[in-house]
Amino acid sequence: MAPRSLFLQRFQPRDLTKAWNQLNLFDEIQFAFLIYSQVYSKTLMDFQKRWAQGVLDLEENAPPVVILKQLAHLLKNKVCYHPPMLVDHPDLARENDRHVFVYLSREKMQKVLEEKSITFGLEAVLATTMQPYRSDLVLQEMVRAHNIAWPHRRVEEPDLEGFIAIFASTLFIHLLELKVTNVYGREVACTFFVRQGTGNRSYDVIACGITQFTKNAGVMPRPAVPSPEPDLTLRLSGPNQKREEGDMKPAIVNLKKETSAT
């Protein structure tokens, strides 16, 4: 079967802009990740294997075809978060799934959904494990964390009103870890990853929505469960998750010390 005759509808991101509280947002995000990993990925792998076999059956050996055949060998065994294309370094699934979130303005979130791409030109993508339903975190604190993690592009509060949830591919590099302070005075680990820009390449987005960070540092959010602080941090990406090969050793940075020094 010729590769060009194959077609697969890419994953449709779950629209969570109407989520009404942090627990609802958590449940919907978790459900979206499960649908992709346990349902859609099976259809995706079947498509990739058929596409790869079609490429490997080609008798032509021109340089572009050789590159496609190298890609075909990879896609027979690994989920790829974008359609098959002539690239040297595809966005492949990691050995252990890594759920990350990219924070962006509402306008840019719409652009991502319309163009089905998380990269624009050579602009790097900054992602974090910190979940958007964390109402115990203040928006201003998250802005400072992003600016410390990636000072090459300064962000302001409107730039973190929206989010997209994705699986981090093998092209996302572990950047560093920060410790942010929540409204209860407790430190929370915040891990950042960065992916260098590769042009407008398609990428499967799992979900999108509006963040629920607290905008007023003087207002204490009401816990969604009967405890001083909702323990939601372990549900999507827990600290017991094994570090993957190729990850740089994290640099622990205390956000308070960083900001006070400036």
Swiss-Prot record:
It comes from the Bacteria. It comes from Rhizobium rhizogenes (Agrobacterium rhizogenes). Induces differentiation and growth of neoplastic roots (hairy roots). Seems to function as a tyrosine phosphatase. The gene is rolB. Pfam families: RolB_RolC. The keyword Ligase does not apply. Residues 221-262 are annotated as: Disordered. The keyword Transport does not apply. This is Protein-tyrosine phosphatase RolB. It catalyses: O-phospho-L-tyrosyl-[protein] + H2O = L-tyrosyl-[protein] + phosphate.
